[in-house]
Swiss-Prot record:
Gene Ontology cellular component list: AP-1 adaptor complex; clathrin-coated pit; perinuclear region of cytoplasm
One GO-annotated biological process of the protein: vesicle-mediated transport
Subunit structure: Adaptor protein complex 1 (AP-1) is a heterotetramer composed of two large adaptins (gamma-type subunit AP1G1 and beta-type subunit AP1B1), a medium adaptin (mu-type subunit AP1M1 or AP1M2) and a small adaptin (sigma-type subunit AP1S1 or AP1S2 or AP1S3). Interacts (via GAE domain) with RABEP1. Interacts with EPS15. Interacts with SYNRG/gamma-synergin. Interacts (via GAE domain) with AP1AR (via coiled-coil domain). Interacts with CLN3 (via dileucine motif); this interaction facilitates lysosomal targeting.
Superkingdom of origin organism: Eukaryota
Region described as Disordered: spans on this chain: 597-628
UniProt keyword Oxidoreductase, yes or no: no
Protein's UniProt name: AP-1 complex subunit gamma-1
Natural source organism: Pongo abelii (Sumatran orangutan)
SUPFAM superfamilies found in the cross-reference section: ARM repeat, Clathrin adaptor appendage domain
Cellular location(s): Golgi apparatus; Cytoplasmic vesicle, Clathrin-coated vesicle membrane; Cytoplasm; Cytoplasm, Perinuclear region
Alphabetical list of InterPro entries matching this protein: Adaptor_Complx_Large_Subunit, AP1_complex_gsu, ARM-like, ARM-type_fold, Clathrin/coatomer_adapt-like_N, Clathrin_a/b/g-adaptin_app_Ig, Clathrin_app_Ig-like_sf, GAE_dom
Domain GAE: 702-817
Membrane topology category: Peripheral membrane protein
Amino acid sequence: MPAPIRLRELIRTIRTARTQAEEREMIQKECAAIRSSFREEDNTYRCRNVAKLLYMHMLGYPAHFGQLECLKLIASQKFTDKRIGYLGAMLLLDERQDVHLLMTNCIKNDLNHSTQFVQGLALCTLGCMGSSEMCRDLAGEVEKLLKTSNSYLRKKAALCAVHVIRKVPELMEMFLPATKNLLNEKNHGVLHTSVVLLTEMCERSPDMPAHFRKLVPQLVRILKNLIMSGYSPEHDVSGISDPFLQVRILRLLRILGRNDDDSSEAMNDILAQVATNTETSKNVGNAILYETVLTIMDIKSESGLRVLAINILGRFLLNNDKNIRYVALTSLLKTVRTDHNTVQRHRSTIVDCLKDLDVSIKRRAMELSFALVNGNNIRGMMKELLYFLDSCEPEFKADCASGIFLAAEKYAPSKRWHIDTIMRVLTTAGSYVRDDAVPNLIQLITNSVEMHAYTVQRLYKAILGDYSQQPLVQVAAWCIGEYGDLLVSGQCEEEGPIQVTEDEVLDILESVLISNMSTSVTRGYALTAIMKLSTRFTCTVNRIKKVVSIYGSSIDVELQQRAVEYNALFKKYDHMRSALLERMPVMEKVTTNGPTEIVQTNGETEPAPLETKPPPSGPQPTSQANDLLDLLGGNDITPVIPTAPTSKPSSAGGELLDLLGDINLTGAPAAAPAPASVPQISQPPFLLDGLSSQPLFNDIAAGIPSITAYSKNGLKIEFTFERSNTNPSVTVITIQASNSTELDMTDFVFQAAVPKTFQLQLLSPSSSIVPAFNTGTITQVIKVLNPQKQQLRMRIKLTYNHKGSAMQDLAEVNNFPPQSWQ
């Protein structure tokens, strides 16, 4: 058989292909030749053929038939064969294929090889694609190489240990003795990988930071040497000594200094040194400064150091690089809760970012601008945000309008300003506002008795000839119907009165009724307004009767029903019409956002920043709730009854029975979800059904200590308790989930199960995202009925996405305080 062509010749041949079909033909022809060579067990050219196969794999063509040949090359004694074999294994194999387990013995032999380069190949492969089974079998060899004096092997072994810990976290303690001397190494590669290993251990186990805090002085010394060292061509990047190692050390210091006064004190000086001495003309220096800022803000640093960190972020906002401006805005958004006054100093720069062409920067600047709004700057900030609302892209208008509504409601200096601001939003972006904007504005106007004449006149002017903003038209129609007499009489004192006749008012409402832009809801507002004017106007009652009778035959069922009922009011109940259509009374405000939260910042009290994101609409991700019944093995379990219908019906049977086996399920199936417009009338009685729309308790049994139910991998779940003196069998547990890691935890779902003697109701969570750096929490309420006063116990299930991986964990909570159930 002729010798196969070399890899270089194959690459040159493939590059000459003019079409994709011609390239496929060349690849198929070469693959056929490689298969023939594999069948003949040709050891001479196996290495060359596998190398060509890997190139084809990189081009996107199938190369799975070369997997076993890679294993044969790994078993070879030639280094060149091993190198290609291990490379092929890393590209063609993964832990989902059983073939990779055949490599375990070869990797073990190579880890004990006398040549460091062979050992390095084995470490690289294990650290790249080793499964949990392989990691368990080979962790001992990795630990031995971690203690060797060879720096080439130590750095590779440290990275391999990181992979082992990720796959098998319970093997973490095996590597603890080997980590003691890692930071004494002079080699930067070993130092870098050692810091990566220590960081991974601290992130995986909540007990590790306390164990490694004794290394803080050593880490500080290493970082100081890097800053003070002279020019080193081996490690210099743009005039900075080994910035990669500096960034890694800063991240580890951030973890070790979190919630620890002594460690934070030990690193304050070096952080100040890094922040003041790092060159910012190059992107490398900006990366180090960014990590320094994150570390300063996350540990218990001095107030002066925090001001320095925020000033660095302020300088970042002036940088020409859009990426740097974006991370500065994101970081300021995280720190504004704790250092509100310091961030306020950079308000003008932040507002300027609203004019940036980059949409990501604009969105972050908008969110941060709303977070900076308070009672002192509300007028100036609203002026800028209204200008932004007028000129921004459509995808920003909904969030911006919602933020303006919340800010105006919270900090409005006067009712007139409040009404003018909301009307300006409705005029500018009426089609993008939330559904509750119309009733909220109507409620505000109703409660502002002294502003009725002013408001109806402004609204009348606003909709003259323009019905494009339907929410604005709806509010205007409602106000004209309620206060049309004030409009006609010209009683407005705030601005010059206008001369409007009754017929002109009816003309504009009839125009709304016949406009092609008017929705069915808007027409309903207009028809009701016309009907209400029959008790406020004196000269146009006959015209109103005629308009109402015309719509008695409308093809719109809702409009027709209204018109027929109004006609009946004229004909049969005319004596009651004035009483039925009298002016609406002052409405009581129903607060849905909870009380204003006050935070302490630098000795001054500031309102907590506004959340610009609307509350989550639609069903929460609770489809996995059925799996939770698997938690209490061997016990009868009461399934959780959700308080709101989910997107798909679930029951206590079906897939649950697959999970539970012989566990007896006694809970009734959950009812199928009802349509949103139809209330659920029949629902099985359940504990605390009558409390869902009322405050939970008026008399709370105080003095129940809170507990930490779960703390692992940066996620912490705390339980606080409330009990009613009038119904002591009911315990209300409020869970708070916080996240101390560097990335948000998304799609978070908390589930719980209790034994059959209890009843449990799990209310909807406040969000599905647990913010990073402990910048926010998810709250969720659990109601437990314990009529027999038995000791409370619970199993919980947590599912969420973190760092691109789906996480799931089960835990049992048995440490409930006696006051919560006795």
